[in-house]
Amino acid sequence: MTPSLYNPLAIASKPFPAIYSEKILIFTIFSAFAEFERDMIVERTQEGKMLAKQNPDFREGRPKKFTKQQINHALTLLENHSYKQVEDMTGISVSTLVRAKKKKAAEAING
């Protein structure tokens, strides 16, 4: 009886080294394709960034959710209200308020 591709028991009847060698071969092929695809993604991303940087209005990174005016308004509200109250009023998270307050204090010192 010859081994068939449609017979799963045919693979199990092969000696162990052949199965191991086939697994290594398949793993190597899939690894090479994965590495190739990753390299292609990196290359396309870098090309896209270079094209985007030609635009004078391009800013790298995540866009700001709140304007400076909104942050400053929230910081003035902090003078009379708690962080939680200001968060409820403005929708600006406590962590963002703390970060903005530290940044404002550092700017005042470095001035």
From Swiss-Prot:
Record keywords: DNA-binding
Family recorded in the similarity comment: Belongs to the site-specific recombinase resolvase family.
The keyword Transport is annotated on this UniProt entry: no
GO molecular function: DNA binding; DNA strand exchange activity
Protein species of origin: Bacillus subtilis (strain 168)
Domain Resolvase/invertase-type recombinase catalytic: 1-56
Annotated DNA-binding residue span(s): 83-102
SUPFAM superfamilies: Homeodomain-like, Resolvase-like
Protein's UniProt name: Resolvase homolog YefC
InterPro entries listed in its UniProt record: Cry35Ab1_HTH, Homeodomain-like_sf, Resolv_N, Resolvase-like_N_sf
Cystine pairs: none
Pfam families: HTH_49, Resolvase
